[in-house]
Amino acid sequence: LGIGDEGSILGSIPHGVDTFDSTFPTRSARHGTLLTRTRGRVNIRRSENSTLHEPPCWECACRLCRHHTLSYLHHLDKAREPMMWTLATEHNLHYMGWLMRTQREKILNDEV
């Protein structure tokens, strides 16, 4: 469909689109991008992440955010460790699930 990033989804929902099939969260993860509530898109490959000993998103309850830091993820990516892509994919899918739950609540409350 080509509708998969946050902006496209949020722009489509008010027009009645309620089904999305996209590789965006997994492709973003493979390219080192984490989708977060508090920081927006985080490019784990940026050098400043090598010294940030904090989770990618404080508000996220996924395994990556509960147990790993940006500096560790940066290290995994630099080492081309497949675990980085697995954790990032899981996180991005968790984020997209959260995004859709919040939109569903807004629809039920007539806020969209």
Language-model features: locations:
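Glycine-rich phosphate/ribose-binding loops and adjacent secondary-structure elements
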Residues: 1-56
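C-terminal extensions of enzymes
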Residues: 57-112
